[in-house]
Amino acid sequence: MASTTPITMEDLQKALEAQSRALRAELAAGASQSRRPRPPRQRDSSTSGDDSGRDSGGPRRRRGNRGRGQLRDWSRAPPPPEERQESRSQTPAPKPSRAPPQQPQPPRMQTGRGGSAPRPELGPPTNPFQAAVARGLRPPLHDPDTEAPTEACVTSWLWSEGEGAVFYRVDLHFTNLGTPPLDEDGRWDPALMYNPCGPEPPAHVVRAYNQPAGDVRGVWGKGERTYAEQDFRVGGTRWHRLLRMPVRGLDGDSAPLPPHTTERIETRSARHPWRIRFGAPQAFLAGLLLAAVAVGTARAGLQPRADMAAPPTLPQPPRAHGQHYGHHHHQLPFLGHDGHHGGTLRVGQHHRNASDVLPGHWLQGGWGCYNLSDWHQGTHVCHTKHMDFWCVEHDRPPPATPTPFTTAANSTTAATPATAPAPCHAGLNDSCGGFLSGCGPMRLRHGADTRCGRLICGLSTTAQYPPTRFGCAMRWGLPPWELVVLTARPEDGWTCRGVPAHPGTRCPELVSPMGRATCSPASALWLATANALSLDHALAAFVLLVPWVLIFMVCRRACRRRGAAAALTAVVLQGYNPPAYGEEAFTYLCTAPGCATQTPVPVRLAGVRFESKIVDGGCFAPWDLEATGACICEIPTDVSCEGLGAWVPTAPCARIWNGTQRACTFWAVNAYSSGGYAQLASYFNPGGSYYKQYHPTACEVEPAFGHSDAACWGFPTDTVMSVFALASYVQHPHKTVRVKFHTETRTVWQLSVAGASCNVTTEHPFCNTPHGQLEVQVPPDPGDLVEYIMNYTGNQQSRWGLGSPNCHGPDWASPVCQRHSPDCSRLVGATPERPRLRLVDADDPLLRTAPGPGEVWVTPVIGSQARKCGLHIRAGPYGHATVEMPEWIRAHTTSDPWHPPGPLGLKFKTVRPVALPRALAPPRNVRVTGCYQCGTPALVEGLAPGGGNCHLTLNGEDVGAFPPGKFVTAALLNTPPPYQVSCGGESDRASARVIDPAAQSFTGVVYGTHTTAVSETRQTWAEWAAAHWWQLTLGAICALLLAGLLACCAKCLYYLRGAIAPR
């Protein structure tokens, strides 16, 4: 498509000013001549105000404001200045008039209705209306209520929320601009197309019409015409604008205007009768019926022909049982038949409904009957008190008189019949020695069971306590609505008409000591009105009515023929320039520089940087706790850095000696040993006063009682050994910390999209590429940051603190809240306390812990040669100077402040339909943990392969789509292991650690005897259709209505082809 140079408002203003100056010069020259004004010419009958006699199919004859009488197509742009000058040169000059000269009069302007009006001003045009008049594009007016060529003079609409339902109609011509020119910011200027051909609207409407707005709310199509709808604000007032868009040429040039057609806007239209035939009441009723059918179909619980679920897997009998139960090993229960809650079962000679006999958890499917060959005893599974038991039954002989007894499964009692037709088994005194729990008599369930009670022995497998949950069951969305018990806790005491509720129970209303439960909106509204403190039911009724009110409002507004003129007779599609997106693709991109993905073009993260405003916070030197010392196999005469120069490094000793709050201690080991040096004991008086008289020193002198002198091996026991230690807080010459404050930080993500670079931020998370638009879900900016630039012995590193410091709170002593010096010479913080020196033996348990704040531990170390020993020094934390030390900075800062916790989300809107690449390799290390056929999701985790998103399937069932890398999800398992997983190609086996549904607990009571026969439920499709004939009839009617609605939508889309792809 050929490109056109955008016409800016500045260029248009310069051209209009030049044309205005020429016009003023021409008018001034004409006014200076002495001539008599011509009488006004009469309008021809074809251009009179009565437009009823003209041909509506052909072009209109219009006269310009110059009165030259030539034909001109006012839908085109004005002629160039060369043609205009040539036409002036061919026109003969007017002859001089003999009338006396008169004063110059204001020029008069043709109004298009046979008259003229004085021009308001002679200066340059100041608004688009004056600019259109100056260009000579003022066609004759016409009555907007009569028929008019819709393409020669088109109509746009404006309406404001501040003025109510008042619609302003703006009639104007199109200039020959083709597609509207775009400015540098991607917007188009509607003032370039403002060429009115109807009544001039008020000034505030013209100002709103020419207000620039780049966002387009939607495109409205009507036949071959296209309208663009916009929302914008002018001076605090919100306006809606419906602009007529020009047609676009397929070859890049402006296409010719379509043939002029005439359309009479009436209440009924003969051209489109389908728009009127289907009104708001019919749409509301049809939508109500369809929604009721959808809700009823989803919740009514239509039963299939047969339950095809797999039979339940029973647990194996426990091994820890008594020897007298060994004969039951060969009597394992057979697999029962599958059925559903619509079947019947035989109890004695009577057939009863299964829902009246079996407990609730069996009604959900998976229940059965286990008939064994032995009539009197057998094994089966009992469910009682949320526990599963593997039970062995023994008949009891009938008692002489009816005696009530209490069961282990329930607290209810039942009377045993007085007589029994068959003798009972003599196993009354059998015990459950090998079983753990679950023993007790079983109450009789049915009157047809004439046998006596049974002793139930079982092994407890699991114990769960699910809470009570309810659901609502609706028949076709109409009342009455029933309450369905999903799970029930017996302790809650919910009853239906006095009968305890079990899972699967359906009841209009449940009662318990906690209150009442119902699904009926009328009852809910009544309960909410009666109990003003609880508005849950009223809110539920309100939420139920809101969708229908919205449907009514939408249908009423969409089906009205008049009201919002052209806006309400079309359908909203999408923004201006109909969308060319084929489809949307979504994937993730990791946040490490160099990560790449395919969506569907290659996207790579080139780097991450952040921008901020930097304020220098100065520099400081941290306190440094430094210690030194020496282990000497004799007593020195001069305890100082000079006297101990042979054992102590000179430079550290001098730096520590000149430091702040110095601590210096001298210990003498074995001062009271016997022998030739025993007289030295008197020198070590507490405080060292005697020693200082003979050996002057500045350190504290302490005797080291109980310490070993093994460090100086090879000497007699009367050897005296000394230990010297020196420590203080110093300013290290090569340790500095500079502080910088970063405000208004903004993270910039540098992406490479198909080779093209693109930067996204939280303010602009989009990338426009030739392939489509990329939207990035970027994390929020970190906010204010504090940067610590630490320089330790030439190794410079930066640490970042999140947020601004609270200098009036807990951060008052931190480095960022102190006064710093530019040359890093100031020590930050108060002077720390004097360090504490302590002599610790090598086998002291104290060495297993860390030194306390401001403590220094010294330990003599045995040397490898005689008279050679060393000293091990351990310094603790910095005490009161902790907050100024590098350790505090590392504990309160991070090395990467803009690293997000998760990946970046990429949403790509493609230009043409493409499909994202899908991984075909199987996932790796997939683990499945949980249970199957138990209604609880199991945990599925593993590693997705590269090459695109993995559409994970587990045993043929879709689990979800995951990007390459580790994934964790939950899925319902319907089959037992083994599990095969794949990503659409080859499959692999996953490791599974699951438990079967028999190990899961349910709510209920003992479901009866093993001798109860359950008839298998089978139902043909004909029987099902005969039982549901009314629902099928209603569904067929709804299907016909839905087909009619779809046909109307298809016809509407057919008529909107001009808006979807304007020609």
UniProtKB/Swiss-Prot annotation:
Residues 556-582 are cytoplasmic. Glycans are attached at N353, N371, N410, N429, N658, N759, N791, T1011, T1012. Residues 301-534, 583-1028, 1050-1063 are extracellular. Keywords: Calcium, Capsid protein, Clathrin-mediated endocytosis of virus by host, Disulfide bond, Fusion of virus membrane with host endosomal membrane, Fusion of virus membrane with host membrane, Glycoprotein, Host cytoplasm, Host Golgi apparatus, Host membrane, Host mitochondrion, Host-virus interaction, Lipoprotein, Membrane, Metal-binding, Palmitate, Phosphoprotein, RNA-binding, T=4 icosahedral capsid protein, Transmembrane, Transmembrane helix, Viral attachment to host cell, Viral envelope protein, Viral penetration into host cytoplasm, Virion, Virus endocytosis by host, Virus entry into host cell. It comes from the Viruses. The chain crosses the membrane at residues 535-555, 1029-1049. The record marks A300, G301, G582, E583 as: Cleavage. One of its GO terms (cellular component) is host cell Golgi membrane. InterPro entries: Rubella_Capsid, Rubella_Capsid_sf, Rubella_E1, Rubella_E1_1, Rubella_E1_2, Rubella_E1_3, Rubella_E2. Residues 93-107 have a biased composition (Pro residues). GO terms for biological process: clathrin-dependent endocytosis of virus by host cell; fusion of virus membrane with host endosome membrane; virion attachment to host cell. The keyword RNA-binding applies. The modification Phosphoserine is found at S46. Residues 30-69 are annotated as: Human C1QBP/SF2P32-binding. Residues 1-131 are annotated as: Disordered. Residues 279-300 are annotated as: Functions as E2 signal peptide. GO terms for molecular function: metal ion binding; RNA binding. Structural polyprotein: Specific enzymatic cleavages in vivo yield mature proteins. Two signal peptidase-mediated cleavages within the polyprotein produce the structural proteins capsid, E2, and E1. The E2 signal peptide remains attached to the C-terminus of the capsid protein after cleavage by the signal peptidase. Another signal peptide at E2 C-terminus directs E1 to the ER, with a similar mechanism. Residues 563-582 are annotated as: Functions as E1 signal peptide. Residues 70-87 have a biased composition (Basic and acidic residues). Structural polyprotein: Translated from a subgenomic RNA synthesized during togaviruses replication. Structural polyprotein: Contains two internal signal peptides that are necessary for directing translocation of the glycoproteins into the lumen of the endoplasmic reticulum. This is Structural polyprotein. It comes from Rubella virus (strain TO-336 vaccine).
